[in-house]
């Protein structure tokens, strides 16, 4: 095996945009990683799921293209 073929595996601080931080090990250089979501703020882990208003989106679509159909019918 070649010497020095594996990257250095160091302790790394992970910081989330919500303010949560934790320590893990990684090959990332610099010793710190910044993430947008983590298990403390992600809806899957917290149980706070957002409901998308799909009915409103469909109504907007139909309203938008009803105008096009009205023009074609003239």
Curated annotation (Swiss-Prot):
Query: What is the free-text note on the cofactor?
Result: Binds 1 zinc ion per subunit.
GO terms in the biological process aspect are:
translation
The UniProt record gives the binding positions of Zn(2+) as: 16, 18, 38, 41
Gene Ontology MF terms: metal ion binding; rRNA binding; structural constituent of ribosome
> Is the keyword Iron-sulfur in the record?
no
Question: In which family does this protein belong, per the annotation?
Answer: Belongs to the bacterial ribosomal protein bL31 family. Type A subfamily.
Function of the protein: Binds the 23S rRNA.
Name of the protein in question:
Large ribosomal subunit protein bL31
Its encoding gene is what?
A: rpmE
């Amino acid at each position: 095996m070649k010497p020095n073929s594996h990257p250095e595996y160091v302790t790394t601080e992970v910081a989330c945009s919500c303010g949560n931080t934790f320590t893990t090990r990684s090959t990332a250089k610099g010793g710190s990683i910044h993430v947008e979501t983590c298990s403390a703020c992600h809806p899957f882990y917290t149980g706070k799921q957002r409901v998308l208003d799909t009915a409103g989106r469909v109504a907007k679509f139909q309203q938008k293209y009803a105008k096009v159909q009205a023009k074609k019918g003239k």
